From Swiss-Prot:
Keywords: Carbohydrate metabolism, Cleavage on pair of basic residues, Disulfide bond, Glucose metabolism, Hormone, Secreted, Signal. One of its GO terms (molecular function) is insulin receptor binding. One of its GO terms (biological process) is negative regulation of reactive oxygen species biosynthetic process. The gene is Ins2. Insulin decreases blood glucose concentration. It increases cell permeability to monosaccharides, amino acids and fatty acids. It accelerates glycolysis, the pentose phosphate cycle, and glycogen synthesis in liver. This is Insulin-2. GO terms for cellular component: cytoplasm; cytosol; extracellular space; nucleus; secretory granule; sno(s)RNA-containing ribonucleoprotein complex. Pfam families: Insulin (PF00049).
């Protein structure tokens, strides 16, 4: 009887620590292969679309400027296009830099 009373707090602790299915994936940081695995899990047979920018495009704003067809002083339209491109949120920004939910991942399914 005394042994059972000693294990009662441990049993209560284990019950409280049990993960609940609905809370197992609320919001998480997902990067690299973890992000791809989560997309496979969420999208299943539908598949998903993901076109990452190259490191050069991310690090060098002049590359994006040249791709828009201009150089320095090309005009306000080019400046506006660059600003919109910077504000555009991709899946990496949503899930790796910030946190995302399964519902946000579903937006990237086909």
């Amino acid at each position: 009887m005394a042994l059972w009373i000693r294990f009662l707090p441990l049993l209560a602790l284990l019950i409280l620590w049990e993960p609940r299915p609905a809370q197992a994936f609320v919001k998480q940081h997902l990067c690299g292969s973890h992000l791809v695995e989560a997309l496979y899990l969420v999208c299943g047979e539908r598949g998903f679309f993901y076109t990452p920018m190259s490191r050069r495009e991310v690090e060098d704003p002049q590359v994006a400027q040249l791709e828009l067809g201009g150089g320095p002083g090309a005009g306000d339209l080019q400046t506006l296009a660059l600003e919109v491109a910077r504000q555009k949120r991709g899946i990496v920004d949503q899930c790796c830099t910030s946190i995302c939910s399964l519902y946000q991942l579903e937006n990237y399914c086909n």
